[in-house]
């Protein structure tokens, strides 16, 4: 009985420590990508070009593509008008660290 309890606790603690919803990415990875995407916008790329670039990336977890697509939408949307390359990364890092 104790063995099953310990296995259950191990499974729960492993699940809590899992990287979801970021996949294998860290908040710094998210911030770095946001800055990269903002640099694309500043260089004159369109949202469609940025989304096409996402298709060429390799992902360790399906949720990573979903997250990066959401960042592209933010960067190329109304919020991105007021961001710099640096501030885009800072905003996304802060949002990630606070769980948003």
Q: Where are the predicted features?
A:
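Sec-dependent signal peptide recognition
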Residues: 1-7
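Residue-level hotspots at or immediately adjacent to binding/recognition sites across diverse folds
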Residues: 4, 19, 50
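N-terminal signal peptide c-region/cleavage motif recognized by signal peptidases
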Residues: 13-16
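Functional surface patches built around histidine and acidic residues
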Residues: 38
